[in-house]
């Protein structure tokens, strides 16, 4: 129904609250379950497999927001937000930017300025899951003192009544219930207590909380969709008969091969996710401790976290496609199997930022050239490329370029 009517899965999310699942990894004294990263991956997988992938993705973003607050928890945020998630308070993350696409770490269109008692914050987001429906929003902007340094980021938490959202703009191929519409916080006042962590902490908290929880949770979601599609194919092919040859569809070796490969590939992806989640558990006491500001625990595993997302998103596209082949024309219809919904939902995995193209390059580039080669904020000079291009210049072109650079340097010095 959520898929057909573009309905936000509020009821499904609220159903998770009484048993503590909205605070899955929060301490029990805050109303949480005190669980770990492995359980988190299993929960998102289960919701996507047996329920609704839109709900699973909204849950992932909610957990990301909750854990970003927990990473830099204060008495204020504990009482106002974290202890209330058991009552059905739903959060989300808003990290995208209309100017930089899936490069969500580079918020060109956002900003903040310090004022008495807090900050005035501008946040423009091209995609925000649960936009207009979540109760609180953890968002990232450049810091008040960023001075052109886009690595100087800060994080704020704001309430629903402060933001402007346009959920009616969301009409996507899949994940149709998650309402990933645009969001605007138009230089609204945000009290100082709602700064999450210190000024300039955004890049560190992104690596330590936002990225790890998104990548673990979304990978679980894609694996859950794969498992759900396999479930559907097994149920259908074991009862569908071809009376002319006296065989069920599952009796054909080609169907057995396809299902077998799908199971093996999906279980390999699941094992990879649970393995990385277990590694995170070991360095955080089962998600119950966090490193000091400026240090990393989960963030040291980014290279592996990128890989699990790439693998799960790649696998789900292949698996659901093959299960559709196994189910034939019946699978192509919306009813009765609903396999086509799994196919559409699974397509989101590849394009959800960081996209698989970005992740593939990240992994390869860092393996070959080191993490510093990524240059997230486009500040490193590629001297090799620069010197190579200069060799192509004629003497006159070099003089022209030199004159221009000297003039620019003079202008910059005067303005400074």
Describe the role of every protein-language-model region.
Residues 126-132, 214-218, 349-353:
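Glycine-rich phosphate/pyrophosphate-binding beta-alpha loops
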Residues 2-3, 267-311, 324-332:
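C-terminal helix-coil-helix/basic helical segment that borders enzyme active sites and/or dimer interfaces
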Residues 7-18, 22-129:
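Glycine-rich flavin
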């Amino acid at each position: 129904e959520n898929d057909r009517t573009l309905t936000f899965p509020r009821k499904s999310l609220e159903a998770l609250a009484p048993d503590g699942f909205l605070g899955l990894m929060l301490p029990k004294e805050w109303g949480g379950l005190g669980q770990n990263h492995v359980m988190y991956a299993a929960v998102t997988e289960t919701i996507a497999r047996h329920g609704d992938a839109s709900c699973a993705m909204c849950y992932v973003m909610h957990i990301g927001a909750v854990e970003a607050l927990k990473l830099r928890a204060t008495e204020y945020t504990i009482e106002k937000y974290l202890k209330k998630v058991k009552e059905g308070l739903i959060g989300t993350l808003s990290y995208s930017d209309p100017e930089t696409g899936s490069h969500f770490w580079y918020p060109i269109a956002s900003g903040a300025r310090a004022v008495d008692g807090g900050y005035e914050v501008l946040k423009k987001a091209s995609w925000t899951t649960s936009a207009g429906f979540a109760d609180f929003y953890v968002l990232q902007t450049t810091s008040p003192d960023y001075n052109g340094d886009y690595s100087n980021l800060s994080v704020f938490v704001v309430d629903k009544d402060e933001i402007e959202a346009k959920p009616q703009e969301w009409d996507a191929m899949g994940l149709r219930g998650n309402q990933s519409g645009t969001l605007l916080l138009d230089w609204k006042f945000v009290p100082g207590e709602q700064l999450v962590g210190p000024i300039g902490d955004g890049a560190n908290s992104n690596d330590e909380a936002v990225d790890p929880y998104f990548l673990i949770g979304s990978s679980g979601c894609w694996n859950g969709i794969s498992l759900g599609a396999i479930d559907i194919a097994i149920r259908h092919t074991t009862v569908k008969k071809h009376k002319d040859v006296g065989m069920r569809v599952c009796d054909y070796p080609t169907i057995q091969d396809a299902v077998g490969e799908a199971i093996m590939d999906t279980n390999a992806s699941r094992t990879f996710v649970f393995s990385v989640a277990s590694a995170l558990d070991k360095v955080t006491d089962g998600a119950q401790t966090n490193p000091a500001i400026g240090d990393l625990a989960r963030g040291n595993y980014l290279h592996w976290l990128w890989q699990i997302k790439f693998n799960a998103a790649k696998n789900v596209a292949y698996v659901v496609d093959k299960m559709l082949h196994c189910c034939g024309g019946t699978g192509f219809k919306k009813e009765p199997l609903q396999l086509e919904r799994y196919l559409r939902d699974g397509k989101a995995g590849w394009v959800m930022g960081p996209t698989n193209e970005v992740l593939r390059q990240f992994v390869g580039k860092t393996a070959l050239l080191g993490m510093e080669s990524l240059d997230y904020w486009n500040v490193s000079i590629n001297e090799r490329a620069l010197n190579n291009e200069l060799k192509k210049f004629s003497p006159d072109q070099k003089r022209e370029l030199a004159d221009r650079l000297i003039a620019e340097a003079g202008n910059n010095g005067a303005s400074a």
